């Protein structure tokens, strides 16, 4: 899911508020800095005795609402490590990148698309090694966000694997398995909750947008002509879920993506955003992905990922 969030506001009052929140979370046992006795580790956090219960309650409330209370959604728990071909088919190996720029003086790195722009020109941040001067930014380079590792004792290209950057692909590659072992038929959904990993250039604020995080994801497979109808349905369902969770309406909004923001697989995407101390940031993305994913995996794997509707006497890719 594409995240489009405002950068942190450096207003002193908001910075103080964030510091108070972080300190409160530590005192109350909600969240601790990871590896705290060693000075912490950038953008990693541990959930304490109270925090882990709170997080568990949220996950269970989501799973109950999305799976257990519905007849047309089932759950799975896919592996974090998957065959590299999965990421080739999904486009992550070639295209899961952010534009990276680096200051030639202080060597700080920034996401180019998150820097402010004025009259078509990027406004460079202030350089910590130059008094009252801006950073000298080089040309943007594409930086792949996936964490690479090796499976087995030999570190060579034949043993390369990746920590999954999203939970969606584990759902798509199990489409036929779920179809064959349940009585489900489109429209139906597959959901899972699990860890994902993204080597973010500039991690976000506190536990928002970290390199290791948990996703709650559901993919809903429908006949092609029903896509727009179900897209509207899930936008309303998901907003209601956040309201029922106790969020104030003035602090949450549904923001449709502009056409130039849409991912290559999407014909429509909306973000559910929350008003954080630093501005609006994405909590959840709802996308009409069409048949892109199943077709891509069918082409790369050589497996038939279509569905035959006996009533309509029609075969299609949901």
Provide a role label for each language-model segment.
Residues 2-318:
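TRNA-recognition modules of translation machinery and tRNA-sensing kinases, especially anticodon-binding
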């Amino acid at each position: 899911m594409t995240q489009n969030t405002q950068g942190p506001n450096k207003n002193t009052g908001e910075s103080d508020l964030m510091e108070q929140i972080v300190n409160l979370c530590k005192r109350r046992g909600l969240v601790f800095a990871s590896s705290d006795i060693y000075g912490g580790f950038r953008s990693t956090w541990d959930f304490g005795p109270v925090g882990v219960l709170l997080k568990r309650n949220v996950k269970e409330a989501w799973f109950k609402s999305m799976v257990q209370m519905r007849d047309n959604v089932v759950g799975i728990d896919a592996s974090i490590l998957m065959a590299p071909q999965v990421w080739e088919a999904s486009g992550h190996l070639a295209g899961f990148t952010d534009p990276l720029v680096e200051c030639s003086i202080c060597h700080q790195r920034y996401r180019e698309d998150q820097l402010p722009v004025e009259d078509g020109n990027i406004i460079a941040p202030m350089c910590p090694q130059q008094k009252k001067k801006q950073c000298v930014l080089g040309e943007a380079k594409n930086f792949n966000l996936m964490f690479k590792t090796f499976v087995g004792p030999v570190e060579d290209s034949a043993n390369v694997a990746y920590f999954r950057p999203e939970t969606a692909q584990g759902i798509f590659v199990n489409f036929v398995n779920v179809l064959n072992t349940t009585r489900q038929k489109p429209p139906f959904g597959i959901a899972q909750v699990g860890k994902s990993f993204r080597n973010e250039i500039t991690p976000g604020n506190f536990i928002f947008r970290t390199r290791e995080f948990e996703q709650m994801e559901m993919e809903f497979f429908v006949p092609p002509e029903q896509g727009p109808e179900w897209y509207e349905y899930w936008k309303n369902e998901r907003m209601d879920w956040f309201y029922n969770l106790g969020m104030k309406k003035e602090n949450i909004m549904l923001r449709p993506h502009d056409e130039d923001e849409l991912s290559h697989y999407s014909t429509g995407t909306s973000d559910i955003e929350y008003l954080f101390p630093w501005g609006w940031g994405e909590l959840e993305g709802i996308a009409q992905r069409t048949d892109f994913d199943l077709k891509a995996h069918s082409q790369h794997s050589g497996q038939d990922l279509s569905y035959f509707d006996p009533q309509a006497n029609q075969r299609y890719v949901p």
